[in-house]
Amino acid sequence: MTEATTTAAPVETPLPEATLQPDTGEESFHEHEARTMALTSHETAFMAELAPHAGATPRRGLRFVNVYRLIRTSLPLHEHETLVGGEGEQTAYRALLTQLAIVTGAPAIAPVYFDHLAALAAGNLAEAREYKGLADLIAALGEDDRVTASTEAAPLLGALQILRDSVAPQGLGNDPALLATLHNTASVARRYSFTARPH
């Protein structure tokens, strides 16, 4: 007599725990990096305007772009709205990009620029103050022999003029608030300067 053979029912193998982890709703590092490195059209347009003043060589131009991307990636996502704004209306990204263009395209006289900026910003906070803005900063630099005698005067003053033109429709061409924004973002730009790093 032949015994009947029985086949055991297949046992379902559970998936590895790694694939069963709950969705926390949090971005991974790579997702965060991808989102923060994606520049807005407002940023790329302003960078294109500044590019001729950010250095006479492709290498300097590439450094200008890459440094800004690096800074942007280091920011939490919630700070991007403050940096750029939904319509590109914020001045912080323009102030930062302008100063990155200066340290890249006019490294020899960048320290002179930062000295003038600090002096005017401090004057705006003094008790007996006469408010100064970007137009005053440009004028002061244009009267400084260290600037006018330098071959880097054109990229320095050119970058600042582009910033001034960009904020003119908002009525900020000589607003002390813009000078304060330049001063507040100056330390970030100076970290990536070979000649004007903060002490």
Go through the PLM ranges and name each one.
Residues 1-199:
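The feature marks long, low-complexity, polar/acidic/proline-rich intrinsically disordered regions embedded
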